[in-house]
């Protein structure tokens, strides 16, 4: 996604009237790359799907906090990695 397209998407995500459509576009654009990033960490397909869903829930609830200090994709990947690590830590604590 170009920087200009990303900036337009961010503007639409911050507008209540266009937020849902913009979020659907974000999910369509980033689902596959985020899936594979999470899959490298989590390994299981089913668990990766769960973490990906949690990632998008976190993005939806936190989008108003995105300030644009980094690219949107960088912010999304950071959330995905954090969600994957949180998942692994929970799994580890359940197994102990």
Report residues per predicted region.
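Short alpha-helical functional segments enriched in proximate histidine and acidic residues
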Residues: 37, 41, 62, 83, ...
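Short, charged helix-capping/linker segments at alpha-helix termini
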Residues: 15-25, 35-54
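Arg/Lys-rich amphipathic alpha helix in sigma70-family domain 2
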Residues: 65-67, 81-96
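N-terminal module of bacterial RNA polymerase sigma factors
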Residues: 1-33
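A short, glycine- and basic residue-enriched loop/turn
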Residues: 45, 49, 63-69, 73, ...
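Structural recognition of an alpha-helix C-terminal capping motif at a helix-to-coil junction
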Residues: 36, 50-57, 70-82
């Amino acid at each position: 996604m170009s920087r200009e397209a990303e900036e337009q998407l961010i503007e639409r995500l911050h507008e209540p009237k266009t937020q849902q459509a913009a979020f659907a576009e974000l999910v369509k654009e980033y689902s596959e790359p985020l899936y594979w990033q999470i899959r490298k960490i989590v390994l299981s397909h089913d668990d990766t799907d769960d973490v990906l869903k949690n990632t998008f829930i976190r993005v939806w609830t936190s989008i108003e906090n995105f300030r644009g200090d980094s690219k949107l994709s960088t912010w999304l990947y950071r959330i995905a990695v954090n969600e994957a690590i949180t998942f692994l830590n929970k799994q580890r604590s359940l197994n102990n």
